[in-house]
């Protein structure tokens, strides 16, 4: 047996020498003794391709490329040892999750931590590390029980940690014993079986690409040395370390220590040892700058390089996106102008999570093919989400979030239905479930979902044909969605063991045709040329089946709860990863600096070279701290490197990255993160600055205007990117900035392209103004018709903002409805409750003033009970919380009823109409208009309450409007058309009083009654009567009254002097009205109602003429945008010139009346 060491610095030709040696042997003896080429997992595909592409060999029978795991699989297949299946990392984590739950009561340290996310994974890593370093459960127990007399202050804590780990390690080994092999046991088994393996006997073994080995791997190598004919080890180091391991500060500490261990092993085995040192750098013979970096990077002091620097570039960028875009442009330039292929490029990242998603986005924009080395998590694959959400449904009372998470994976969809149609139906059902609060038994009881678009608390309507059709579709969708999940739920309820639960889940996947659906997704991905996605669909299904098989195999007869089953399955799916091979040869390689292995790379981009990233700070999130590891190492327990050693090894990884390309090296770093926080350059950048003092950093500018005109041409790499940058430059021009002529040329070229639709659309946005153009007459008529039938509130909405009215009444956009109790719902309940009470009084021939407190309470409770099932999809009956809300509402209605009764006792006014309709079947006719443009308009609605009183001047009428918020009548709002309801109601009542009531009436006022349950604050204790009196004052009605003493006295018969507690008016000693009374003359009322009618006409004409401008009003601090549902549609933005509020001047009531009088005089004189 012979052992040869190939030792040389990076780029010295070690791998090339091995490949050439293998190729020579294959040419010389194609069917000779086996050749084993042992490399890391990440390097197997690359080396297989390198050997296979040799044109004169034509295939390989003799030579094979292996990783340790593939070699184990091959040896054990031929020698035995495969009778017990291996358990994957996923299976181990699921088993550990179960063991943690069973034994957490025995833990000394990890009782609380065991419930945290990621704990199971950390434990699995630690136990795997024990196995790799040949530490048995008994060793862990012995370490935990060792004395605590050392100077290490954390030894007691370490002892307790090891105690807990020892329990789990021992229990895991017991669970697997005789049935399964841990995924790390394959190396131990491989070392045992190598003496029996024909593939090893007499073989030539080449080992390349490794920096260090675990004790398990060293045992395998020891057996290879003993049983192979010859073993060649290739290690990156500047010199052999045969007799002594290198100093810990040596750049090649890691590989030097590996050399020392291998040399001592070979020496103990009496192998024939030889060493071949490779000097110089073959890789960098045409790039002296790179040769300088390779040779001088770790030399201090190093001679500054003064030659040409074309092969080396440091790039600075504003942020990570600008950094990647700069690299993408550079790659395009190298391919286009430098004669390189994409496969000649490599991007190395120290922290891939910072760049991975952004890189996919940027490279897609630039049309760059790429392959990201490494295993991507399966967490976001539809199948994994389908399983997780399905179990959430059956365990979590069918919450709508879980149900629709499941549905939106599209794996629940019927196989034979058009997907787009099904998506729309699922969206509609989701909207229904959100609006109706569907959950739990509502899905499983068999009761049909009832759909009603139009519901009234006061009247019952028959279902429309449209409602019936929608209800049918909703129930059909519900049936096919719920049926398989109900079946899964029933099976899970019956299942008691892990085996039966795993079977139930598998049958669910089969029932829903998941294999066929995934295969269809795979075929579509292949047809679209997305080979990586195609691989993922197949791997996801295989991984899930293997997971269930391991689950059932290891713990099949164990009885567990559904909650623990779900928890273990969640743990298992979290550890699932895709293992992908490059789907094409000509791709940019994107790798992790510490794990990836490269060969034949011409241009390397080392990105993200920031402080704290390169070199990387050691991760201390493991189960054992760095101090724990250092102490264990001091007492002779070998584990993986502690943080201090890993930090030292970072410099070797950096060295390997910097020396990896043969032609060009780019080192880049951003100066800020996505949030604008400053990022500092790495010490690597500073070191390169020392080696190349004359080097000028290149700026990867996010915007072209930051670089010279010549450099701006580099931003025109392809049509899509050119369109984006051209649009951004022309946008600067629209803001009166100077731009290069390059962009006008680019604009002309792009607009002349045969397919220039995207460019045209993009460039048209440059001249976009956030304005809504007036609708053409045919469009306006089609939307609104020749006859408008609307409400007063609709006219108020139009006057508040024309566009908001257009969105709601023209486009008929609606907000998504939610199952919640909003202020309008409560207001509707109050209105309807008071109407029901009034109806009961009329039936029993009672007056409000006749009511006792008990009657108020009984009538109020009865009214709310009758209305609750009709309110907002029965929300008041849906939960204990809402039942409590219902009781609160009953108390408020009771309070209000009592106050109304007290008001009636002190008033000469009596209700003459409640919920009085005008238009339609109401007793009053609608308010009608013939507009100047030929259209007609009809306003309909309902008046809360009309009161009448007999006075010496005849019949008086007043309007009372119930509001759940405190408000009065602001004449400025009336003037601007924002508060038209009350005066419209008064106008209609007075105008038609003779037909309706048999005599002409005079306006007495308009009042708002605030429905609420007030709280009284007092600095001193108060008696019950005092409290009631204060509460009574809180219900004073606000509004506008007729400035007549008799009318005021009729509203409050108790008022003789001072302020009224019922209305916002008062009397002086002489009987005249106080100056602070909200009162006007009868003539003023007519002025106001005439103005309201003119406002309606103007609004109606504007609507039918197609006015839809985005001009919301602003009156003091009030604006309709505050509660507008359509802000995302109009995109109103004060920073834009064209978007300004329509500022309305706030004036006192007297000023408003003066304006109206002047306008009336002007009209009379015109």
From Swiss-Prot:
SUPFAM superfamilies: P-loop containing nucleoside triphosphate hydrolases (SSF52540). Residues 1-390 form the UvrD-like helicase ATP-binding domain. ATP binds at residues 8-15. Its EC number is 3.1.-.-. Keywords: 4Fe-4S, ATP-binding, DNA damage, DNA repair, DNA-binding, Exonuclease, Helicase, Hydrolase, Iron, Iron-sulfur, Metal-binding, Nuclease, Nucleotide-binding. The keyword Cell membrane does not apply. InterPro entries: ADDB_N, DNA_helicase_suAddB, DNA_helicase_UvrD-like_C, P-loop_NTPase, PDDEXK-like_dom_sf, PDDEXK_AddAB-type. Despite having conserved helicase domains, this subunit does not have helicase activity. The heterodimer acts as both an ATP-dependent DNA helicase and an ATP-dependent, dual-direction single-stranded exonuclease. Recognizes the chi site generating a DNA molecule suitable for the initiation of homologous recombination. The AddB subunit has 5' -> 3' nuclease activity but not helicase activity. This is ATP-dependent helicase/deoxyribonuclease subunit B. It comes from Bacillus velezensis (strain DSM 23117 / BGSC 10A6 / LMG 26770 / FZB42) (Bacillus amyloliquefaciens subsp. plantarum). The gene is addB.
